[in-house]
């Protein structure tokens, strides 16, 4: 089995070393606010990677952490008007993330460790780094502990970048402005339960050490893949790697990074006020359509979110899914049982995914198959071949964008669809009679998305096309 992936560390395409299993660690969310589409795009990409590996017969041990203690979470608690504590916010928002993952068909990780459950492990790791003289207690006598970049000559190997962010550099007590925090001393403004006792006094861990510790605890000192968003490359992943190497770990063989999400050509950021929450996106399109949208750009490319591109992707997905339901219904009406099989996935499909997880290219192959199925139904061609093609398409989508099998295009479903259609048509007529042309046009557009044309009281049906 060969799977080639782009490795950020070596800056080239490398072949995954497929041992008995593939270990995958992905940096999860800091749970201070509800999930946005950038979080979910990353989650969907790594879910596709996991599904593809498992389809190829490789067991995957998948770990995705949750950062449930952080300055941002504490700031959210201070600014909230509901009186929620920081840990209540972390618990609630963690639930929102898991609901979003579930809605988008992202399989849960094997382990989802919380930072707050691993404080003793983190303290032990910091003690080892101090013993190795690559970390030190703050020079100003405070309880802060820093990692010494000067003591780790290979620092910067992941991104070829050595200068830290300005906010990190101004912390007092450092030997070198570039050194970064391993342990943060408790502040007078910190709320109750937001600190732990340590050899350096009460405080909490720095962000970067958390992932180094949890990744090696669950996956060992050497594992296959470390993933995350491109925004985490520096300083987070650079610091993670430095800490792990200083602790004696090889760490990840391959570093993967998903591209950023822009909104109307501008980087999505809270500071710009243009973050698109998952719940808002899901108010416009179905979960499967949103997942499909995330996959229309290569995982390393920037995805430019626009209302128009989301709508187009939704229409494309609805037509694709509509074709599948159409074929299911056609085969059932022709008396064919669903006993078709897939002996081997399309070679080009497999090659695309093996080539740095080229999902857009793989989706193009799915669309070609969908067009072929429509032609086979229209010409009433070989039913066995049609059924096998349908099974192959469903199999391919089970890796990329699973079909919701709770929605089936059976005869009973057709009856329900007719009843629903009648309700929509009557609602449109009522809106027109009241002069509510906005609602009337909206209902007509919704019907058009299902290939149902309404004009002057006449209704016509088209065949869904992929």
Curated annotation (Swiss-Prot):
Its EC number is 6.1.1.16. Monomer. The gene is cysS1. NCBIfam families: cysS. The keyword Hydrolase does not apply. Binds 1 zinc ion per subunit. Gene3D superfamilies: Cysteine-tRNA ligase, C-terminal anti-codon recognition domain, HUPs. Its cofactor is Zn(2+). Zn(2+) binds at residues 27, 211, 236, 240. One of its GO terms (cellular component) is cytosol. InterPro entries: Cys-tRNA-ligase, Cys-tRNA-synt_Ia_DALR, Cys-tRNA/MSH_ligase, Rossmann-like_a/b/a_fold, tRNA-synt_1_cat_dom, tRNAsynth_Ia_anticodon-bd. SUPFAM superfamilies: Anticodon-binding domain of a subclass of class I aminoacyl-tRNA synthetases (SSF47323), Nucleotidylyl transferase (SSF52374). A motif ('HIGH' region) lies at residues 29-39. GO terms for biological process: cysteinyl-tRNA aminoacylation. This is Cysteine--tRNA ligase 1. It comes from the Bacteria. ATP binds at residue 270. One of its GO terms (molecular function) is zinc ion binding. It is found in: Cytoplasm. It holds the Pfam family tRNA-synt_1e.
């Amino acid at each position: 089995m060969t799977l080639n992936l782009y490795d950020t560390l070596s800056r080239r395409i490398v072949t995954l070393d497929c041992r008995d299993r593939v270990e995958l660690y992905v940096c999860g969310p800091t749970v201070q606010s509800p999930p946005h589409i950038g979080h979910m795009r990353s989650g969907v990409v790594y879910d596709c990677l996991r599904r593809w590996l498992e389809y190829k017969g490789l067991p995957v041990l998948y770990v995705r952490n949750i950062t449930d203690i952080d300055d941002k979470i504490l700031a959210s608690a201070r600014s909230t008007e509901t009186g929620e504590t920081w840990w209540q916010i972390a618990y609630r928002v963690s639930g929102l993330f898991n609901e979003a993952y579930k809605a988008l068909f992202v399989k849960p990780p094997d382990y989802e460790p919380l930072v707050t459950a691993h404080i003793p492990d983190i303290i032990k790791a910091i003690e080892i780094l101090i013993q190795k003289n690559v970390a030190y207690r703050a020079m100003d006598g405070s309880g802060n502990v820093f990692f010494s970049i000067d003591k780790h000559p290979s620092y910067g190997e992941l991104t070829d970048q050595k200068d830290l962010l300005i906010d990190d550099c101004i912390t007092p007590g450092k030997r070198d402005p570039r050194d970064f925090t391993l342990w943060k001393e408790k502040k007078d403004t910190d709320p109750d339960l937001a600190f732990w006792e340590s050899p350096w006094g009460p405080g909490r861990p720095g962000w970067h050490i958390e992932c180094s510790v949890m990744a090696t605890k669950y996956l060992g000192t050497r594992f296959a893949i470390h993933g995350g968003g491109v925004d985490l490359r520096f300083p987070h992943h650079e610091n993670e790697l430095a800490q792990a190497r200083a602790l004696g770990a090889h760490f990840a063989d391959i570093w993967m990074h998903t591209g950023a999400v822009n909104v109307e050509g501008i980087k999505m950021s809270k500071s710009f006020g243009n973050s698109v929450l998952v719940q808002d996106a899901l108010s416009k399109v179905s979960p499967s359509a949103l997942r499909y949208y995330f996959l229309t750009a290569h995982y390393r490319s920037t995805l430019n979110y626009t209302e128009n591109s989301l709508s187009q992707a939704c229409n494309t997905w609805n037509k694709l899914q509509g074709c599948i339901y159409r074929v299911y219904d056609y085969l059932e009406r022709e008396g064919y049982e669903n006993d078709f099989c897939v002996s081997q996935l399309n070679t080009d499909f497999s090659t695309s995914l093996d080539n740095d997880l080229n999902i857009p290219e793989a989706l193009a192959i799915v669309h070609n198959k969908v067009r072929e199925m429509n032609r086979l139904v229209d010409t009433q061609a070989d039913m066995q071949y049609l059924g096998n093609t349908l099974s192959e398409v469903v199999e391919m989508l089970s890796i990329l964008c699973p079909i919701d099998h709770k929605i089936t295009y059976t005869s009973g479903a057709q009856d329900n669809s007719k009843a629903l259609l009648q309700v929509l048509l009557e609602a449109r007529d009522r809106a027109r009679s009241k002069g509510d042309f906005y609602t009337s046009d909206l209902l007509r557009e919704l019907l058009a998305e299902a290939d149902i044309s309404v004009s002057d009281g006449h209704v016509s049906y088209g065949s869904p096309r992929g």
